[in-house]
Structures are given as structure tokens and as C-alpha cells.
Amino acid sequence: MGSSSGVAVKIAHPNEVKAIARAKIKTDKRDSEVLAHLLRMNMIPEVYRRSTENRQAQRVLRQRAFYVSAMTALKNRVHAFLAQQREEIREVVARETNIFSEKGQKVLLGLDLAPREKKLLEALLKTYRHLETRIGESKAFVEKLYEESREAQFIRTIPGFGKYLSVLVAVEIADLTRFTDTAHLHAYAGVIPSIHSSGDRTHYGKIIKAGNRWLRWAAVEAVWPAIRADFDLRCFYERLARGKGANKAKVAMARRLLTIIYKVWKEGRNYIAYRR
């Protein structure tokens, strides 16, 4: 409202306005005075202001990510349910290449289960079909965003990124110029380790997880398909996994993918795999 009436509006980042967070006595009047002093000294840490279109795209894509995550959890639940059944049931299920295809679901619904067990499985598959419908509804929107975004098209050339993840990353980053280098992008995604330093000792802890969790989710989600598709990325991951363990290697791979995203976006080009 303020910007439309000719008044410059600044939105302060609540986690970074340390003067307010540390105050012993907090009242609206005191907070306003502190903000006024910070503004006068040009020390207000601002939140990035997204366009209306970007915020709308965020909501749709994040909702889709929620549905995808819920579907993954539901699939795991179905597999766990079937693993608890008697051997002849498990043998019938094992013959199906995809139990969630139309044919596979018919096989599951035809299993010789106890009445209560059958109802449980029917409820799980009904929920699966509902999630599948909701995800399908966003497909046209994802396609439209992809066709309109050169950045998403560059990102899609990177191993591990399909259309949806490419569009999600492009929308969450929005404007690459707000990141001065790859380290700032890593911090924004929350894939850097926490650091505790005292004297001459420095301890690196778990990742901070304080950044954009959707961007972090997309980068981590792309790790496994990326290392399967790209030889050099696989070598990078396996070398780290041997020395630091699988979890740390996975986070390092997510950082590597974000670095590649930064470079192809900034240079306006497709990803080029190293040729031996």
C-alpha cells in the first residue's frame, strides 16, 4: 500500500534485526525507535520482495512439492503394509513391476486379504489416487512456467533436474543478482555447516537449515539421479562418501549442484558435462 502511494517501503528481516532480538525490555514503542535509528543509519536488513506473479508461482509449486512428499510417504506405507502379509501375498506382489500403475493397483485390490486389512489397503490406494490427481492438476502450470523461463531451461540441462525441479529452483531463486557468489546461494539454501569457533579450534556441525527449505529440498532431491547420470558427479560423491560418510557427501553434492546452477544461470548457458 505504501509503495503505491509514493512512500518507499522496507520490510525488515526479523531474524537479522539483532538490536530488537537482544532487547531486555520489548515494547512496540521501543521497537519502533530502534527500527527508526537503524533506518536512519541505513542498517535495516531487508527481506527480498518478490513480485506478485512469483509469489503465486511459489504457492502452486510448493503445494505440489507437499503432495509429492506425501505421495512418497504413502508409497512407503503401502510397501510396509504389504511386507507384513503372508508369503503367498508377497509373492503375488513381487511379480508386479509397478504396483502403483493402473494394472498394479487392480492386482493389489484383488489380493486375498482379511476384511479389515483389505479396507486399510483400499483407503491407502484411494489416498494415492487423490494425490496423483492433485499433482496432475499442476502439470500444465509447470509446463507454462518452464516455457517462459530461460533459467529453468538452463537448469534442466543439469543432471538430476527435470522440468518441475528446474522450475521450482528458478522460482525460489527468482533473481540471481541478489547473490554475490555461490557461497551466498549455499547459505540461502541452508546447505552450509554450522561453525563453532573458540580460540584456535573450529568445529563444523550439522547444516544450518535456516535458509529456503524448498530450494534445499530441490537440490537434495536431485542428488541421486544426478550421480546416476553423470560420471564426474558420481566420482565426486563416492570420494566424499568414503572419507566423510554418505550424509555429508549428499549435502556436499547438493552444494555442488547449486554451484552448477549458479554458473549456468549467470553465464546464460546449458550445462556441459566434462568429456574425457
Regions found by a protein language model. Name each.
Residues 43-45, 74-78, 136, 174-178, ...:
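Short helix-capping/linker segments at secondary-structure and domain boundaries
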Residues 154-157, 163-246:
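Phosphate-backbone recognition surface of nucleic-acid-processing proteins
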Residues 70, 74-77, 165, 181, ...:
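Residue-level detector of well-ordered alpha-helical segments, enriched
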Residues 3, 9-58, 96-99, 104, ...:
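Short alpha-helix plus adjacent loop in nuclease-associated cores
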Residues 200-201, 236-276:
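Low-complexity, acidic/Ser/Thr- and charged residue-rich accessory regions of DNA metabolism proteins
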Residues 62-154:
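Glycine-rich, often acidic, oxyanion-interacting loops/wings at catalytic, nucleic-acid
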Residues 36-39, 61-64, 68-71, 75-83, ...:
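Short, amphipathic alpha-helical segments that act as regulatory/interfacial helices
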